[in-house]
C-alpha cells in the first residue's frame, strides 16, 4: 500500500437508541455514531413484533392531503 493516500482506519463506538453499544473499525471521521436500530432491537433479529416508524411519509401525506379526501 502507498503511504499517505488511504483514510485513517480507527475504532468507532456505536450507540443504539435501545442502549446497546458496540465498537467497530471504520474510516468514519467521528469517534462515535448514534443508531436508531441495531440487531438487539430490530424486529427481524429480536423476534418481537413492534412498529419501527420514525414518523415519515404517511403522516406528512395525511397532513397535506387528508383534508381534501374528507371533503368529497
From Swiss-Prot:
<dbReference type="GO" id="GO:1990904">
    <property type="term" value="C:ribonucleoprotein complex"/>
</dbReference>
<comment type="similarity">
    <text>Belongs to the bacterial ribosomal protein bL31 family. Type A subfamily.</text>
</comment>
<dbReference type="InterPro" id="IPR027491">
    <property type="entry name" value="Ribosomal_bL31_A"/>
</dbReference>
<feature type="binding site">
    <location>
        <position position="16"/>
    </location>
    <ligand>
        <name>Zn(2+)</name>
    </ligand>
</feature>
<dbReference type="InterPro" id="IPR002150">
    <property type="entry name" value="Ribosomal_bL31"/>
</dbReference>
<keyword id="KW-0479">Metal-binding</keyword>
<dbReference type="Pfam" id="PF01197">
    <property type="entry name" value="Ribosomal_L31"/>
</dbReference>
<keyword id="KW-0694">RNA-binding</keyword>
<keyword id="KW-0699">rRNA-binding</keyword>
<feature type="binding site">
    <location>
        <position position="18"/>
    </location>
    <ligand>
        <name>Zn(2+)</name>
    </ligand>
</feature>
<dbReference type="GO" id="GO:0006412">
    <property type="term" value="P:translation"/>
</dbReference>
<dbReference type="InterPro" id="IPR042105">
    <property type="entry name" value="Ribosomal_bL31_sf"/>
</dbReference>
<comment type="function">
    <text>Binds the 23S rRNA.</text>
</comment>
<protein>
    <recommendedName>
        <fullName>Large ribosomal subunit protein bL31</fullName>
    </recommendedName>
</protein>
<dbReference type="GO" id="GO:0019843">
    <property type="term" value="F:rRNA binding"/>
</dbReference>
<feature type="binding site">
    <location>
        <position position="38"/>
    </location>
    <ligand>
        <name>Zn(2+)</name>
    </ligand>
</feature>
<dbReference type="InterPro" id="IPR034704">
    <property type="entry name" value="Ribosomal_bL28/bL31-like_sf"/>
</dbReference>
<keyword id="KW-0689">Ribosomal protein</keyword>
<keyword id="KW-0862">Zinc</keyword>
<dbReference type="GO" id="GO:0005840">
    <property type="term" value="C:ribosome"/>
</dbReference>
<dbReference type="GO" id="GO:0046872">
    <property type="term" value="F:metal ion binding"/>
</dbReference>
<keyword id="KW-0687">Ribonucleoprotein</keyword>
<comment type="subunit">
    <text>Part of the 50S ribosomal subunit.</text>
</comment>
<dbReference type="GO" id="GO:0003735">
    <property type="term" value="F:structural constituent of ribosome"/>
</dbReference>
<feature type="binding site">
    <location>
        <position position="41"/>
    </location>
    <ligand>
        <name>Zn(2+)</name>
    </ligand>
</feature>
Amino acid at each position: 500500500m502507498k503511504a499517505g493516500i488511504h483514510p485513517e482506519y480507527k475504532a468507532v463506538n456505536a450507540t443504539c437508541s435501545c442502549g446497546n453499544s458496540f465498537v467497530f473499525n471504520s474510516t468514519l471521521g467521528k469517534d462515535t455514531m448514534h443508531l436508531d436500530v441495531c440487531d438487539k432491537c430490530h424486529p427481524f433479529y429480536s423476534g418481537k413484533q413492534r412498529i419501527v416508524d420514525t414518523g415519515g411519509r404517511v403522516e406528512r401525506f395525511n397532513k397535506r392531503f387528508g383534508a381534501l379526501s374528507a371533503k368529497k
